Amino acid sequence: HGVVRHVGTQYMADVSRDALVVSVREGQVEIDGRFHQGRAREGQQVTLSGSQQPSILSIDRSGREWAWVARRTPAADVDGKTLHEFLVWACRETGLRLQFEGNAEAVARDTVLRGRIDAEPAEALRLRLATTALKWRIEEGVIHITDETR
């Protein structure tokens, strides 16, 4: 069906006898098909099927179909790094967007982490945040971090 080249990304490709399906979580993927060429961007799923025009759908960046990423992600070595750095890592690995509210970003940048948690990113996120003064919730693919002390 074609050649797929990623450009600094997280993506998955599924090839069957009838189609090539490329889903992009982060970054972009160049697709060079037999009949069509193009680029799939973050949050898109492109399907090439023979000489038909490519089909482009919007997709979520997190969820069941991306669970394999978390299973393959090594534990983050965050000893001596900030909570902010950890949150950026965890969001990338889970496909969530990060949104700070109130003074939470300053707290995250000032909080230095110690130790290591050998867990998948979502579980590491839950365990790390349980030890901080920050509250968090996930809504529609966004993790909202708020300062509990306010």
Annotated model-derived regions:
Residues 1-150:
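A residue-level detector for the "anchor" residue at the start of short, highly conserved motifs
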